[in-house]
Design a protein with these regions (language model features):
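Ser/Thr-centric signal marking residues that sit
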Residues: 98, 107
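Short, flexible helix/strand-to-coil boundary loops that buttress conserved ligand/catalytic motifs
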Residues: 115
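The DNA-contacting recognition helix of HTH DNA-binding domains
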Residues: 43, 95-97
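Membrane-proximal linker segments that couple transmembrane helices to downstream signaling/catalytic modules
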Residues: 1-86, 90, 102-105, 112, ...
């Protein structure tokens, strides 16, 4: 399947917009065919986009959003309220095994190691009960700029 860069970009934009705005990745049973219908493109085209343009499979794409959702939940202190498995399920993972596998693949660390490191770097969160995702992103941006000076 040959697509122009513009066509591929349009499909990818529609796909990302759908995932972000609808938070479709939270559906543990989300199927590629459902996503294709939702964004108005045929399933075979979506398959080609994953293979040739995004260089990852459908489930890796969806799981990348789920991992980011988990990290956001940790930044909001939700790991203090829920078990690891419950939090993973709330982020769209169907099983503990698939969660651990995906998390390690995208972060290079286990969820437990990530939480320990996060708690070590952000001890104030124990007092405040977490921060919003927006503040978390802002703080990371400031830290990144300081490190590059």
């Amino acid at each position: 399947m040959k697509l122009s860069e513009k066509e591929a970009s349009e499909v990818i934009d529609a796909l990302k917009k759908y995932m972000q705005e609808q938070q479709a990745y939270l559906n543990v049973d989300l199927k590629q065919s459902e996503v294709a219908v939702a964004i108005g493109y045929p399933t075979y085209l979506l398959s080609a986009i994953f293979t040739h343009y995004l260089k990852m499979g459908y489930y890796d794409f969806v799981n990348s959003y789920r991992v980011e959702q988990f990290k956001q939940s940790v930044s909001e202190g939700k790991h203090k309220k829920y078990t690891l498995v419950t939090l993973a399920e709330k982020c769209g993972f169907k099983s503990k095994a698939s969660f651990f596998r995906a998390f390690k693949k995208f972060t290079g660390t286990t969820p437990n190691e990530y939480i320990q490191q996060f708690d070590k770097e952000w001890p104030i969160l124990h007092i405040t009960g977490g921060i919003t995702h927006l503040w978390y992103r802002f703080i990371l941006l400031i830290i990144k700029r300081i490190k590059h000076k």
